[in-house]
Amino acid sequence: MALVDFIPVLFFAIAAVILQRDLYNKMSKGAFALFAAGTINVTCAGALKATWKLLYALGVCDFEALNAMFFPVQSIGFLLAGIGILAMLTHKQSKSAALAVVPPVFSGTFVFVGLMVAGLGIMDAVLCILAGKLKKPALIAIFILSFVCSLCMGYLSSQDFAEASMNWIAEGVNVVGQGTLLLGICLLRKNGLADYKIREEKAE
């Protein structure tokens, strides 16, 4: 089961790289920096937690710090990515870099869950908007499914399941969520996202 944790991390990492390549020429340096830093944070957080589970399963050690940093790093990462991709649509892009302000470290999980939901929601909403502009409404359903799966995974990951079957369900939901995200982004790319001109449309 520990190895399965790396599958959604890999899916998200591939999806993030594809988006970074396709959106690079559509973002200002500041917006792209926020988006890139956010997606890197999310990928690293997932990889570190998966590594913690693998080390624990193999009986090597219980490196709790890898698990403890998951929520703060991932939630702030989603928020930064969401702000960066939203800025691409809502603000006139310039060459100047943006200043990223993040909240101080907090021990509770409620704040981080809120940040994660907000950032992930913004990111999926912008992807739905892009799908609509490319006249591919079917992709909107894919991104909505990905968002719903991510919300379910967020709830499931906060529960303490004694049965292995429930952990497998949580892993399955996570794989489906990140898999649909990757599928949607690949289809956006296939349908011309890389060549889509956001600035020209706004100017018209």
Mark where each language-model region is.
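Conserved phosphate-interacting/catalytic interface
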Residues: 47
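Polytopic alpha-helical membrane-helix bundles and their juxtamembrane interface segments
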Residues: 1-40, 50, 54-69, 76-204
